[in-house]
């Protein structure tokens, strides 16, 4: 079932000018877009005849979604998570445990997502004969980036249809605004529009930049950080 595409009428009236809409990806099963990627990986795991799946998580949503689909598909599930994130994401950690997943605390480095991804990959490389790995963001080896991107592109596949239903066509001067962290929701939101005329559709990413003129940031693309 497609997630809703709704007009934010009060915000539109308050700000004036632009017609403001929201794609309610939080309607997706489990409350986030991460479910699309998790389902894809669970199906791949079953196709490969493996009984275990591993993944990473930061805010906890990716781990929660993987634990949900692992339970549904009858798979064992390990979720690698930085200890700092475990401390501040208790509700999602509780959900993972209720679904039968094992949370593997990661104490190395910053004790957050980047280190959880690294530890997850290390574990998978040592156990790839019996374990399937799914990465929750657009990071890591190319094939995992492609799988995540294709899965979360369900957002823009739905949105394209909904825009045409609402306006009769893709409207001119359309601005698609999305947060940018690991990139899964941003790519998923933009995927179907990447090749559109840039005078017709503008893709706008909002990312954490940290304190002004500081090295305390996540290497934002706006500061010309390298990709790959």
Regions found by a protein language model. Name each.
Residues 29, 37, 48-69, 73-82, ...:
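A short, small-residue-rich loop immediately preceding and capping a beta-strand
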Residues 17-28, 48-53, 136-144, 166-174:
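Glycine/charged-rich beta-loop-alpha catalytic/anionic-binding loops adjacent to active sites
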Residues 1-50:
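Positively charged, low-complexity intrinsically disordered leader regions
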Residues 65, 73, 106-121, 141-228:
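Glycine-rich phosphate/pyrophosphate-binding loop at beta-loop-alpha junctions
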Residues 6-21, 125-133, 149-163, 220:
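Acidic-glycine-rich active-site phosphate/pyrophosphate-binding loop
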Residues 38, 42, 66-67, 93, ...:
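Generic hydrophobic/aromatic pocket-lining and core-packing "Φ" positions
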Residues 74-113:
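A glycine-rich helix N-cap at a beta->alpha junction
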Residues 4, 22, 34, 41, ...:
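Buried hydrophobic positions in well-ordered alpha/beta secondary-structure cores of metabolic enzymes
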């Amino acid at each position: 079932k497609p997630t809703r595409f709704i007009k934010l009428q009060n915000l539109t009236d308050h700000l004036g000018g632009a017609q403001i809409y929201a794609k309610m990806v939080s309607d997706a099963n489990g409350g986030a877009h991460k479910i699309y990627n998790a389902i894809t990986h669970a199906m791949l795991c079953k196709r490969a005849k493996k009984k275990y799946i591993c993944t990473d998580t930061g805010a906890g949503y990716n781990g929660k979604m993987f634990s949900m689909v692992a339970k549904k598909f009858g798979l064992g599930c390990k979720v690698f998570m930085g200890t700092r994130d475990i401390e501040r994401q208790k509700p999602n950690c509780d959900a993972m445990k209720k679904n039968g997943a094992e949370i593997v605390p990661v104490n190395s480095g910053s004790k957050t997502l980047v280190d959880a991804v690294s530890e997850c990959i290390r574990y998978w490389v040592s156990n790839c004969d019996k374990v399937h790995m799914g990465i929750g963001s657009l990071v890591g080896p190319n094939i995992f980036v492609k799988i995540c991107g294709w899965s979360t592109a369900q957002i823009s596949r739905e949105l394209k249809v909904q825009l045409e239903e609402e306006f009769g066509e893709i409207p001119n001067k359309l601005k698609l605004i999305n947060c940018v962290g690991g990139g899964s929701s941003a790519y998923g939101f933009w995927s179907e529009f990447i090749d559109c005329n840039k005078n017709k559709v503008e893709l706008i990413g909002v990312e954490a930049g940290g304190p002004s003129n500081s090295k305390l940031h996540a290497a934002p693309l706006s500061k010309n950080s390298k990709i790959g």
